[in-house]
């Protein structure tokens, strides 16, 4: 059996690894997998191990709870994330409030800033810094708890580097403070490094806060999907009375009435009435689907016209929408986090540096140096190997890269997305709202022996009583072109065919070929076929049985789509058009923009499966879409790119949002990611270069040949220089050319 649990208290990969490790040791547990981003534990076992799993996880220092229904669990997760972010914000504010004066007190005299007289006294100078540092340490206590725990577990991480580096600075500073109280006042300006510890803790806390804020938004996609389900439903009891009930309480077999404009609560089959249903949340297509008795309706879709009664056949977590939610969750969860080079190296770097520091101190003691000199060497090695530059190497480049992207209308949600985008070699594009404008428009007009203006006026009059998107396209066209039309005296919708309007005593029939044939009206079949072949939807108009002409309504291609596809091709990137539309419509659009690879008639699960197929074939896939139906595909791709003019669900599921809806942003995002990754590698090189060159000197290499002994202050300066180099290099991303 496979069970899922919600885990709380995890902050890094080491935490998730700890949970996996303790659960895997439980007898009977065949496999345990933790997803850090969704905070879920999945366990495969032969029997129910709930009690043992709860005990093991709680003993490891984490919280665990059962997974509730999708809707309830979403609310629980949202509240927990909100509480965590609130605490992080409070801790960050505390750290900032005390770090700023700490830095001022310790460094102000070096640049001529005035400081209070009493602080000029050595003892007061040291004690003031200690008092200011204590709240900062308290605010950043999580680094020490997680970092030291990882060290003791023999799995050091970035928190371990932060903890050991700042402990070294604080430890030496406390030692110097003791000497100051013994009369060594010269250590006042060369033995105290409290501000280094405070600044490091605060900067890292700021970075973690921003990282967690971005991570918290990954749940927005699921929340938005859950929001599609109405809270209540109108149930018809056996005695014929209707009652409003909680949608969560619905069971299979209940009769439910849905009025125009309402969302359908659960899946089912229509038993009475007809309607047009907006299923864009499933198919992504903007044109409603006509439904009759016996047709299936999907929970979360919108009834655009007509009242109907249906019988529920899937409720709760068994509905199509619930399946889509699970797909998004699983897709988000299946993304392996980018291999964080700094974290990997720190597993070796930390113990090696600690060993070098201890060995160096012991060697100099054996060589006859004093304990004070040995301590100075020990601290110098740890301080010069402080992970500040190492910790800044990746996040600073990512932050600047994100800022550069934002200035271009490319909003990158997190650093992982930016790094993933670098390797994209295949781009999958949805049609509606992505390559096309996303709404029907009149693209062709063929009057039959009647003035074009009068034809459009009569057509708009006939459609003015309809709420159908195709009708709206006609009336919108008339309005944009200054063509006046009157509202009909009456209008009757004809499901699956069109509509009948009465105006000035004349009958206007507007709709498809089926309507014309039913009423014995001859129409231009060649024009009808030509429009159909071009991918347009043909609409015809007849007045009192006389055919007046035909128009074509289609979703127009965006002006920049062709240029965007050409830009991707020039960079050696394959493009695919994957859509829910039929093959003819898909090919017509693909030909217009220059896409050669087409996959049509795809449901959301088909898109998801196709992406999985490409990825298993070694492709690095980016998915570009704008609709709710694209949510799972956006999440399952290596990189999800949403059009800013699309739905909130698509944007929440995506890694990158093109705010202006311009497809040329795809190639810009890829080039930006490559430039950023290049800067990250350079930063890591310089960070380690400073450390590897500085450590031998800090260990006393120069002193062994009669040279000076490196003081912790110079070590701290070297550490600062490495940070400055990393920051300056990252800032180059603001001006680097994207080729």
Tell me the role of every PLM-derived stretch.
Residues 111-124, 152, 171, 404, ...:
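Membrane-embedded alpha-helical bundles of multi-pass transporters
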Residues 17, 253, 412, 424, ...:
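Conserved ATP-binding TGD loop and adjacent catalytic N/P-domain core of P-type ATPases
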Residues 28-45, 50-51, 55, 194, ...:
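Conserved cytosolic catalytic loops of P-type ATPases
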Residues 442, 446-571, 583, 595-605, ...:
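P-type ATPase nucleotide-binding
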């Amino acid at each position: 059996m496979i069970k899922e649990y919600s885990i709380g208290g995890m902050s890094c990969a080491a935490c998730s690894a700890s949970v996996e490790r303790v659960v895997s040791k439980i007898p009977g547990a065949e496999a345990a997998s933790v997803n850090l981003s969704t905070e879920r534990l999945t366990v495969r076992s032969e029997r129910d191990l709930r009690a043992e799993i709860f005990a093991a996880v709680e003993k490891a220092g984490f919280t665990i709870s059962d997974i509730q229904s999708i809707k309830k669990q979403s609310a629980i997760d949202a509240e927990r994330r909100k509480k965590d972010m609130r605490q992080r914000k409070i801790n960050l504010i505390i750290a900032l409030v005390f770090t700023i004066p700490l830095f001022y007190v310790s460094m102000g005299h070096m640049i001529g800033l005035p400081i209070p007289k009493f602080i000029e006294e050595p003892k007061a100078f040291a004690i003031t810094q200690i008092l200011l540092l204590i709240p900062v340490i308290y605010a950043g206590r999580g680094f020490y708890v997680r970092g030291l725990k990882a060290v003791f577990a023999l799995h050091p991480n970035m928190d371990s580097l932060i903890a050991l580096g700042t402990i070294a600075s604080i430890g030496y500073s406390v030692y110097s403070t003791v000497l100051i109280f013994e009369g060594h006042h010269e250590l006042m300006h060369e033995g105290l490094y409290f501000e280094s510890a405070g600044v490091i803790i605060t900067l890292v806390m700021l970075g973690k806060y921003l990282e967690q804020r971005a991570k918290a938004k990954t749940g927005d996609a699921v929340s938005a999907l859950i929001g599609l389900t109405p809270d209540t439903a109108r149930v018809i009891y056996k005695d014929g009375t209707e009652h409003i009930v909680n949608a969560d309480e619905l069971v299979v077999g209940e009769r439910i009435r849905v009025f125009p404009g309402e969302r359908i609560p659960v899946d089912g089959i229509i038993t009475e009435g007809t309607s047009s249903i907006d299923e864009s949340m499933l198919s992504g297509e903007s044109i409603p689907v006509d439904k009759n008795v016996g047709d299936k309706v999907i929970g979360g879709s919108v009834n655009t016209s007509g009242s109907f009664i249906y019988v529920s056949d899937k409720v709760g977590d068994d509905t199509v929408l619930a399946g889509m939610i699970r797909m998004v969750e699983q897709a988000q969860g299946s993304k392996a986090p980018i291999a964080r080079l700094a974290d990997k190296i720190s597993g070796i770097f930390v113990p090696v540096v600690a060993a070098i520091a201890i060995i160096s101190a012991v060697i100099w003691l054996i060589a006859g140096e004093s304990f004070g000199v040995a301590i100075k060497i020990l601290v110098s090695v740890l301080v010069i190997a402080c992970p500040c530059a190492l910790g800044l190497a990746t996040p600073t480049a990512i932050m600047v890269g994100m800022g550069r992207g934002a200035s271009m209308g490319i909003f990158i949600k997190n650093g992982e997305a930016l790094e993933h985008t670098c390797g994209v070699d295949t781009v999958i594009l949805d049609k509606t709202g992505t390559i096309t404008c996303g709404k029907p428009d009149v693209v062709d007009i063929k009057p039959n022996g009647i003035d074009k203006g009068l034809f459009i006026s009569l057509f708009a009059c006939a459609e003015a009583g309809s709420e159908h998107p195709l009708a709206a396209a006609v009336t919108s066209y008339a309005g944009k072109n200054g063509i006046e039309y009157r509202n009909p005296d009456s209008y009757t919708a004809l499901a699956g065919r069109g509509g009948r309007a009465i105006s000035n005593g004349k009958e206007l029939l507007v709709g498809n070929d089926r309507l014309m044939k039913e009423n014995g009206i001859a129409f231009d079949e060649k024009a009808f076929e030509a429009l159909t072949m071009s991918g347009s939807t043909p609409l015809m108009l007849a007045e009192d049985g006389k055919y007046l002409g035909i128009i074509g309504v289609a979703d127009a291609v965006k002006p920049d789509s062709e240029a965007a596809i050409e830009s991707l091709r020039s960079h050696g990137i394959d493009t695919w058009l994957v859509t829910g539309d039929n093959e003819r419509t898909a090919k017509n659009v693909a030909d217009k923009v220059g896409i050669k690879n087409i996959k049509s008639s795809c449901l959301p699960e088909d898109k998801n499966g196709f992406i999985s197929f490409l990825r298993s074939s070694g492709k690095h896939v980016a998915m570009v879409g704008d609709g709710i139906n694209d949510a799972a595909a956006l999440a399952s791709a290596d990189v999800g790119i949403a059009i800013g003019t699309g739905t909130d669900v698509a944007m929440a599921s995506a890694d990158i949002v093109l705010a202006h809806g311009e497809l040329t942003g795809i190639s810009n995002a890829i080039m930006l990611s490559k430039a950023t990754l290049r800067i990250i590698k350079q930063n890591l090189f310089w960070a380690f270069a400073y450390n590897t060159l500085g450590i031998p000197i800090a260990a006393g290499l120069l002193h062994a040949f009669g040279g000076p002994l490196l003081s912790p202050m110079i070590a701290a300066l070297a550490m600062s220089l490495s940070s400055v180099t990393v920051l300056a290099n990252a800032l180059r991303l603001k001006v680097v050319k994207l080729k």
